[in-house]
Amino acid sequence: MSERESMPCDVVIVGGGPAGLAAAIRLKQINAELEVVLLEKGSEIGAHILSGAVVDPKALDELLPEWREQGCPMAQTPVTDNWHWVLSETGKSDLPHLMMPPLMYNEGNYTGSLGNLCRWLAEQAEALGVMVFPGFPAAEVLFGENGAVVGVATQDMGVAADGSHKPDYQPGMDIRARYTFFAEGARGNLTKQMKAKFDLEADCQPQVYGLGIKELWDIDPENHVPGRVIHTQGWPLSESDTWGGGFIYHQAAGQVAIGFVTALDYKNPYVSPYQEFQRFKHHPAVAAILKGGKRVAYGARAINEGGWQSVPKLAFPGGALIGCAAGFVNVPRIKGSHTAMKSGMLAAEAAAAAIAGGREHSALDDYDANLRSSWIGAELKLVQNAQPAVAKYGGDLGTVLAGIDMWMRTLKIGLPISMKHK
């Protein structure tokens, strides 16, 4: 039997999404001598990325200011126009932009494949010397004698369904690091272990979730408007008074990303997010876009919808939560890649400073404090009552109250009230 090998490094990052890749790049930008390892469970970077996406470039501008000129695929399709439809069963109305707070606008944003963006970011990371290992899931957290996180172990290979070892069995490798970043996305197994072990959710609201279903379509060129972004609310979820809605993003190469998000706190046990998505696609306004087209890819993923109230403690001895592992999705904007990237950058800066100061396996409390005072905190506070308002008061009244709350926070009017999740 092969013995388990051990690999030392300065920082190991679990997850090759926007947060993990941004953290890796930022670490090497600060100190090129740092040994940074990034583990991705997918067969390649981007294999498990399923966002639409419309990307706010704020964090990308900070991380790689010349990304537009460096061949980043996201630069191909800037948002050209933005629509918000309120659907009935057979019709639609356009919600005027003036009714929505400025943070809901998409001018200056870009639409494209987040998986392609991650693949490009991985290339930038590797060029800086980051060791990127796709196909290596982190299966176990390693702890030191004092209980601090000291790294992770990768999954054993060649294990039969009954747990026995096949002839080609190979044990996983111990990746031992001064600091470990968990960038697993929503509901990652190791992240849940860290939350429980270090009681990270003691001072926040419970996280709540939605289910996002997405398809990629090749559509008739006559129906394609590159850069057009459409978000919808109302039917069909209005029939069950459930929070959620649809999106249609016209991307490059004659494709649209179409999807549907359903909050998982729906009251009617017969609601099926998948069936609601099928009904959505048959709405006359949506079907007209897809007519003559062909679905080429599809998938689904969990989405953190708890917002600011549900952000846990982010740092603990030897480790930190970044990206959707912590939950930085701006639910009304349906955006989280920019906040995920910024969280990774802030964690990287805190870890680099700690290592430069001779520390290891300590709690990166500066990361937690700096994130809460950053533009991530400012942005999420503006929308923190949106999901709770709809969950408590229903789709129609809740949406109105959420809009009023966002406007009041934007204009700094009234007392800040933080609603709790049910």
Predicted features along the sequence, with ranges:
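N-terminal Rossmann-like FAD-binding beta1-loop-alpha1 element of flavoenzymes
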Residues: D10-V37
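C-terminal auxiliary extensions adjacent to catalytic cores
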Residues: V390-K422
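Active-site-proximal substrate-binding core of FAD-dependent oxidoreductases
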Residues: G327-R333, M345, E349-G395
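N-terminal FAD cofactor-binding segment of flavoenzymes
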Residues: K41-G91
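A short, basic/flexible loop-to-alpha-helix module at the beginning of a structural domain
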Residues: M1-P8, G163-G172, C324
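Predominantly flavin-linked oxidoreductase catalytic cores and closely associated redox partners
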Residues: G115, R119, Q124-A288, L346
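Conserved Rossmann-like nucleotide-cofactor binding loop
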Residues: A19, E44, R187
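FAD-binding beta-loop-beta segment adjacent to the flavin cofactor pocket
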Residues: A300-V331
